[in-house]
A protein has these predicted regions:
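Intracellular juxtamembrane helix-capping segments at the cytosolic ends
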Residues: 94-108
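Flexible cytoplasmic inter-helical loops of multi-pass small-molecule transporters
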Residues: 166-189
Length: 199
């Protein structure tokens, strides 16, 4: 999720502003608007994790993150910037964090706290390492090339990490056990309006 976090995207603030000729305020307005829109979209896309197998959903998130990174490398207007920030905030900060915590909560019955701590430790480590690493890359490459490198890293590395980390978890049996029971019992999910009214 680090690629969609503010600490990471902020590293590209200056080069993008200079190239597009926009002010700090204009960049901030675009960033805030795109972030709000992504959070609203997350409400709908996020709940879809209950409708699909976790492995398929994870690959969807990876593809979206890959496309977001690629789009960043082609920014040439404020419209492209808004779209790139929207997709990156949605796929990175939103869906990546959502998918990881949901997966652990669903499939880790023992040591769930340790597993959750491990993923947040990863984010803290990224907050320390990535700013230094990206600043170093700026000396060698353009910011567009850096984003292209990130896109390649995402599409090549993340699928391998997912497959290697979940190979010992029986995802299919767990998900097959849950879905038929719900269908047999004809359990109806509450709609958002009903939840709000009940509150």
């Amino acid at each position: 999720s680090s690629f969609g976090q503010s600490f990471f995207l902020g590293l590209f603030n200056a080069p993008i502003r200079n190239e597009l000729g926009i002010t700090h305020g204009e960049f901030g307005n675009i960033y805030a608007t795109a972030t709000i829109c992504s959070s609203l979209t997350l409400i709908w896309i996020g709940k879809k994790i209950d409708d699909y197998r976790i492995l398929n959903y994870s690959f969807f998130v990876i593809i979206l993150l890959f496309l977001s990174s690629l789009l960043f490398s082609f920014i040439n207007s404020v419209y492209f910037l808004a779209a790139a920030i929207f997709l990156m905030r949605l796929s990175g900060q939103g869906l990546m964090s959502h998918t990881s915590t949901t997966t652990i909560s669903r499939f880790f019955e023992k040591s769930r706290g340790k597993a959750l701590s491990a993923i947040w430790l990863g984010l803290s480590t990224a907050e320390f390492i990535l700013p230094v690493l990206i600043t170093y890359f700026f000396v060698i490459y353009s910011w567009r090339t850096v984003w292209q490198g990130i896109a390649v890293l995402i599409v090549l590395l993340l699928p391998f990490i997912i497959l290697s980390t979940i190979k010992s978890i029986k995802l299919d049996s767990r998900e097959e056990d849950i879905i038929p029971k719900n269908k047999k019992l004809k359990i109806r999910d509450w709609k958002r309006k009903e939840v709000i009214k009940d509150y």
